[in-house]
């Protein structure tokens, strides 16, 4: 073998290739390219160009200028690149319900038709004509701006068919033939003459009539204004056909269906547009562009400060963890909001940073300059009370809230009883003998205690306005209602005529025999004495008398 090194040919290892001839770039008017992208009508876009609101390659655009593929266009803070259409046109049929507007963004927050449409990549839906918020029916949308402009332009005379329900003018039962004739010939509206190319009565009732109408223009609310010019009121309006495309019967409201590609090609041929994919420019959004970051202003004791809240990163997931710490919690000190003594808000730190902050921020000194609060009050702060003892209830050293002297013979009146002057209770008999145990009624109306009978717990039942506490049962002290009655029957009966109850009738009511209302010195009543009351009077009823049945 020869030791001579082999020389490699550089031509064989070259990665260069013969470049193909560059295709000529498309060039179109700027307002046409913007309309092709669905950013508005050509007339409105021309006005925006004249106002200097659009830039091309960093310079303010001029009216009538052209752009080529690859140019950068800025509009409303967004950046686009002009590029040729490579996909075929698509057309969508949407059955619009009431309550939706045909705009991309509504300042009043109403729902739009674009919220219910399929999502596109690299293009956008363009509405072919508009329907107001109360009009329903067929709405066509396309990705081809040239097709949309041709179908909307009056020079192409594309038919729009509507079904309308009309109320006759006031004082008339139905829409007259004279009104139909005038609308067929044409009437003068605010923006010029208008007419129905076709009008046909298709039904009606006693209150309204149904018509089928056809127009070849797309003015704002043209169908409604034509009927209103004759004094009629439109109560229902639905579009059923646009050109050769009709609304499918099976398509529900709020739903959409895409038109077959062969029908789209036929529609373009009918409008005398070129076949295949349209050789036109459109706008593609710049990938990865950042919108203006939203910010908020925090007003604190030190003044105003801006804070980053939520920037649009066009799908950058790695920024989520960083955005979590954008909103900082403010740790307030003892001074509170708006007080000069409080600590400043910020992050909670520890370690060396906390040590440095403690050296920079000494403790607050008390004194006249800082507003000396004075010495603390003497005594136990817990001894200050924010409640008051009700009248008639005493407090004592015992654990019960109503602690006080208890036992026989206290003779304390019921705090919830109605106090009044003592007097005689009307009745027919003499005084009843003293009860067993010896309690009697004094002149003041209060019940006394004697050594023979203990206090009752609730002799009159629990009053409606009296508080009841669990401790009243757990630790009984003084009870304003009396002590509990001893268990068992009392020793001995109640002396008096007729056994335990008086013989007289005890029907309640003023003037009743043996009864009567309370009152001092009632007629026929004996004066009440200690330990007795008139027989048969008061609240006691004799057996077999009064309201008790035999």
UniProtKB/Swiss-Prot annotation:
It comes from the Bacteria. Transmembrane segments: none annotated. InterPro entries: PsdUridine_s_RsuA/RluB/E/F_cat (IPR042092), PsdUridine_synth_cat_dom_sf (IPR020103), PsdUridine_synth_RsuA/RluA (IPR006145), PsdUridine_synth_RsuA/RluB/E/F (IPR000748), PsdUridine_synth_RsuA/RluB_CS (IPR018496), RsuA_PseudoU_synthase (IPR050343), S4_RNA-bd (IPR002942), S4_RNA-bd_sf (IPR036986). The active site is at 132 (nucleophile). Keywords: Isomerase, RNA-binding, rRNA processing. Residues 294-550 are annotated as: Disordered. Residues 28-97 form the S4 RNA-binding domain. Its EC number is 5.4.99.22. One of its GO terms (biological process) is enzyme-directed rRNA pseudouridine synthesis. The keyword rRNA processing applies. It catalyses: uridine(2605) in 23S rRNA = pseudouridine(2605) in 23S rRNA. Residues 317-334 have a biased composition (Basic and acidic residues). The keyword DNA-binding does not apply. GO terms for molecular function: 23S rRNA pseudouridine(2605) synthase activity; RNA binding. Residues 420-451, 490-501, 509-550 have a biased composition (Gly residues). PANTHER family: PSEUDOURIDINE SYNTHASE FAMILY PROTEIN-RELATED, RIBOSOMAL LARGE SUBUNIT PSEUDOURIDINE SYNTHASE B. Responsible for synthesis of pseudouridine from uracil-2605 in 23S ribosomal RNA. Belongs to the pseudouridine synthase RsuA family. This is Ribosomal large subunit pseudouridine synthase B. It comes from Xanthomonas axonopodis pv. citri (strain 306).
């Amino acid at each position: 073998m020869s030791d001579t090194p082999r020389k490699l040919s550089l031509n064989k290892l070259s990665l260069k290739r013969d470049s193909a001839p560059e295709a000529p770039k498309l060039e179109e008017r700027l307002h046409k390219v913007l309309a092709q992208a669905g950013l508005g009508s050509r007339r409105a876009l021309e006005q925006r160009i004249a106002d200097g609101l659009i830039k091309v390659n960093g310079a303010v655009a001029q009216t009538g200028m052209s752009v080529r593929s690859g140019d950068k266009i800025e509009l409303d803070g967004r950046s686009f690149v002009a590029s040729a259409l490579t996909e075929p046109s698509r057309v969508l049929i949407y059955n619009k319900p009431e309550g939706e507007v045909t705009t991309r963004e509504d300042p009043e927050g109403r729902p739009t038709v674009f919220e219910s449409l399929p999502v596109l990549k690299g293009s956008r839906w363009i509405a072919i004509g508009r329907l107001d918020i109360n009009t329903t029916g067929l709405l066509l949308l396309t990705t081809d701006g040239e097709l949309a402009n041709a179908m909307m332009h009056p020079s192409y005379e594309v038919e729009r068919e509507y079904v309308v329900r009309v109320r006759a003018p006031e004082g008339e039962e139905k829409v007259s033939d004279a009104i139909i004739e005038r609308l067929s010939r044409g009437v003068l509206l605010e923006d010029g003459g208008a007419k129905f190319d076709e009008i046909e009565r298709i039904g009606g009732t006693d209150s309204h009539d149904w018509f089928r109408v056809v127009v070849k223009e797309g003015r704002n609310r043209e169908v409604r204004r034509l009927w209103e010019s004759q004094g009629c009121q439109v109560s229902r309006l639905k579009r059923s056909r646009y050109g050769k495309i009709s609304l499918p019967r099976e398509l529900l409201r709020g739903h959409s269906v895409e038109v077959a590609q062969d029908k789209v090609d036929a529609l373009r041929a009918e409008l005398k547009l070129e076949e295949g994919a349209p050789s036109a420019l459109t706008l593609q959004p710049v990938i990865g562009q950042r919108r203006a970051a939203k910010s908020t202003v925090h007003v604190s004791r030190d003044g105003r400060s801006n804070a980053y809240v939520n920037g649009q990163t066009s799908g950058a997931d790695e920024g989520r963890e960083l955005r979590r710490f954008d909103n900082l919690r403010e740790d307030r000190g003892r001074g509170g909001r708006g007080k000069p003594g409080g600590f400043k808000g910020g992050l909670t730190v520890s370690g060396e940073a906390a040590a440095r902050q403690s050296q920079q921020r000494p403790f607050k000194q008390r004194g006249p300059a800082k507003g000396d609060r004075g010495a603390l009050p003497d005594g136990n702060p817990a001894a200050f009370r924010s409640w008051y003892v009700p009248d008639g209830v005493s407090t004592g050293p015992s654990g019960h809230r109503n602690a006080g002297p208890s036992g026989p013979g206290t003779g304390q009146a019921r705090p919830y009883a109605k106090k009044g002057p003592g007097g005689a209770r009307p009745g027919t008999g003499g005084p009843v003998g003293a009860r067993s145990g010896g309690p009697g009624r004094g002149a003041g109306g209060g019940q006394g205690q004697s050594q023979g009978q203990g206090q009752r717990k609730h002799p009159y039942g629990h009053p409606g306005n009296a508080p009841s506490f669990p401790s009243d049962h757990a630790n009984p002290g003084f009870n304003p209602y009396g002590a509990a009655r001893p268990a068992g029957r009392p020793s001995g009966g109640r002396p008096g005529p007729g056994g335990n109850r008086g013989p007289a009738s005890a029907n309640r009511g003023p003037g009743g025999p043996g009864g009567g209302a309370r009152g001092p010195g009632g007629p026929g009543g004996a004066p009440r004495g200690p330990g007795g009351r008139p027989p048969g009077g008061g609240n006691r009823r004799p057996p077999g008398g009064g309201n008790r049945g035999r």
